[in-house]
Amino acid sequence: MEQNPNPNNLPAELNRTSLYLGLLLVFVTAVLFTSYFFN
């Protein structure tokens, strides 16, 4: 497992970043939809 930690670390960090971006996008979309419906 310690033979090549670089190729194993990069996809994990990329996956985590994309996951956070996805959650942020969903959160912003939900806030916009709730604001639009309440107004």
Curated annotation (Swiss-Prot):
Its main location: membrane. Signal peptide: none annotated. InterPro entries: PSII_PsbL (IPR003372), PSII_PsbL_sf (IPR037266). It comes from the Bacteria. The keyword Transmembrane applies. Keywords: Membrane, Photosynthesis, Photosystem II, Reaction center, Thylakoid, Transmembrane, Transmembrane helix. It holds the Pfam family PsbL. GO terms for cellular component: photosystem II reaction center; plasma membrane-derived thylakoid membrane. GO terms for biological process: photosynthesis. It is found in: Cellular thylakoid membrane. The chain crosses the membrane at residues 18-38. The keyword Transmembrane helix applies. Belongs to the PsbL family. PSII is composed of 1 copy each of membrane proteins PsbA, PsbB, PsbC, PsbD, PsbE, PsbF, PsbH, PsbI, PsbJ, PsbK, PsbL, PsbM, PsbT, PsbX, PsbY, Psb30/Ycf12, peripheral proteins PsbO, CyanoQ (PsbQ), PsbU, PsbV and a large number of cofactors. It forms dimeric complexes. One of the components of the core complex of photosystem II (PSII). PSII is a light-driven water:plastoquinone oxidoreductase that uses light energy to abstract electrons from H(2)O, generating O(2) and a proton gradient subsequently used for ATP formation. It consists of a core antenna complex that captures photons, and an electron transfer chain that converts photonic excitation into a charge separation. This subunit is found at the monomer-monomer interface and is required for correct PSII assembly and/or dimerization. NCBIfam families: PRK00753.1. This is Photosystem II reaction center protein L.
